[in-house]
């Protein structure tokens, strides 16, 4: 008789907690790691996470700890769900406790500042594990809806198809349907760049520019993502799937999206600092827009929407001026 899959989830924010619900419902033994003792205590005693998923009852089988070694003991999978810019430092602390066969799974959607590395590359750098022990999960997965067990689908990607299939089985439930893929780069890029496009659409919504603008930004944003993906060796079909178009549509259309909400506040006239002050959780696109643009320039890829977001968020350009400049670029064929 095989033992239940053991899963460690590193991060007690809304997405980490929601994914712990999926894993528990799929029959895994789940340990949530969190830095704050009071959050771990609340999860263990009240089976809720009042800070990040208030009102959601967690399965009794989900337990929490602040001890990384305890969380990783016997783990088949370690799911990493921290802000992407903190992964390197956090993983350096956790890596000494990894067991030889534990598969590291990124649930993060970002590109590291300075190095322009994808999260899978940061994992490989820090944990010194081969590609068949690194996987990613990506797709249209807004945490609150997942925690409420509303139907959703996602992509689980690993260079080793058999590992992707094991991961698929570990998180397949009646409401969460994962599909396998071996295009790790494509799945990660889809998730990282959609945060930037989500900011752009949010800014446009905050300015009251309308649905034509939104549709144009989503479509041309997907074109930017695909161009970068092709330059990095990704499969272009990945971007028409759940990790590309699916995630992009959810982020650009939902009030639950942190990046869309952040952009909306900027478009309404808030300053960057004012918007940060009213945002409770990390909007990955705020920092990743710079690293995505860095990555694009390293590969010689033109990403004008991303450039526009960077100019508004980090260079103080007026959204009105930025939109005018974006629309005034020289005309060109669509497929470029």
Swiss-Prot record:
Primary residence: cytoplasm
UniProt pathway annotation: Membrane lipid metabolism; glycerophospholipid metabolism
EC number(s) on file: 1.1.1.94
Residues where NADPH binds: 14-15, 35-36, 109, 143, 258, 284
InterPro entries per UniProt: 6-PGluconate_DH-like_C_sf, 6PGD_dom2, G3P_DH_NAD-dep, G3P_DH_NAD-dep_C, G3P_DH_NAD-dep_N, NAD(P)-bd_dom_sf
Top-level EC class as recorded in UniProt: oxidoreductase
Subcellular location(s) of the protein: Cytoplasm
Residue positions of the active site: 194 (proton acceptor)
Gene Ontology cellular-component terms listed: cytosol
Biological process terms in GO annotation: carbohydrate metabolic process; glycerol-3-phosphate biosynthetic process; glycerol-3-phosphate catabolic process; glycerophospholipid metabolic process; phospholipid biosynthetic process
Domain of life of the source: Bacteria
UniProt-annotated binding residues for sn-glycerol 3-phosphate: 109, 139, 194, 247, 257-259
SUPFAM superfamilies (UniProt xref): 6-phosphogluconate dehydrogenase C-terminal domain-like (SSF48179), NAD(P)-binding Rossmann-fold domains (SSF51735)
Keywords: Cytoplasm, Lipid biosynthesis, Lipid metabolism, NAD, NADP, Nucleotide-binding, Oxidoreductase, Phospholipid biosynthesis, Phospholipid metabolism
Family, similarity comment: Belongs to the NAD-dependent glycerol-3-phosphate dehydrogenase family.
Free-text function comment from the UniProt entry: Catalyzes the reduction of the glycolytic intermediate dihydroxyacetone phosphate (DHAP) to sn-glycerol 3-phosphate (G3P), the key precursor for phospholipid synthesis.
Protein name per the record: Glycerol-3-phosphate dehydrogenase [NAD(P)+]
Native organism taxonomy: Bacteria, Bacillati, Actinomycetota, Actinomycetes, Kitasatosporales
């Amino acid at each position: 008789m095989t033992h239940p899959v053991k899963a460690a989830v590193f991060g007690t924010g809304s997405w980490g907690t929601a994914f712990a619900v999926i894993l528990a419902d799929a029959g895994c033994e789940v340990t949530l790691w969190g830095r704050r003792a009071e959050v771990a205590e609340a999860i263990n005693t009240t089976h809720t996470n009042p800070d990040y998923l208030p009102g959601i009852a967690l399965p009794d089988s989900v337990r929490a700890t602040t001890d990384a070694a305890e969380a990783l003991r016997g783990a088949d999978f370690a799911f990493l769900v921290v802000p992407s810019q903190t992964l390197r430092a956090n993983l350096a602390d956790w890596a000494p406790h990894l067991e030889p066969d534990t598969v590291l799974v990124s649930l993060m959607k970002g590109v590291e500042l300075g190095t322009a590395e994808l999260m899978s590359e940061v994992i490989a750098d820090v944990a010194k594990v081969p590609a068949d022990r690194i996987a990613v999960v990506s797709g249209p997965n807004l945490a609150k809806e997942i925690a409420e067990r509303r139907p959703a689908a996602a992509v689980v990607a690993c260079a080793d198809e058999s590992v992707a299939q094991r991961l698929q089985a570990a998180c397949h439930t009646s409401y969460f349907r994962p599909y396998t893929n071996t295009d790790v780069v494509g799945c990660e890029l889809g998730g990282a760049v959609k945060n930037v496009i989500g900011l752009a659409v949010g800014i446009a919504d905050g300015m009251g520019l309308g649905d034509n603008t939104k549709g144009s930004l989503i479509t041309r944003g997907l074109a930017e993502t695909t161009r970068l993906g092709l330059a990095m060796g990704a499969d272009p079909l990945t971007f028409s799937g759940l990790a590309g178009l699916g995630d992009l549509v959810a982020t650009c259309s939902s009030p639950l999206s942190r990046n869309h909400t952040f952009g909306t506040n900027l478009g309404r006239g808030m300053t960057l600092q004012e918007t940060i002050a009213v945002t409770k959780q990390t909007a990955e696109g705020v920092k990743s827009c710079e690293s995505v643009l860095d990555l694009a320039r390293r590969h010689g890829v033109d990403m004008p929407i991303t450039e526009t977001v960077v100019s508004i968020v980090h260079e103080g350009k007026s959204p009105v001026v930025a939109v005018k400049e974006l629309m005034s670029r020289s005309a060109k064929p669509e497929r470029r």
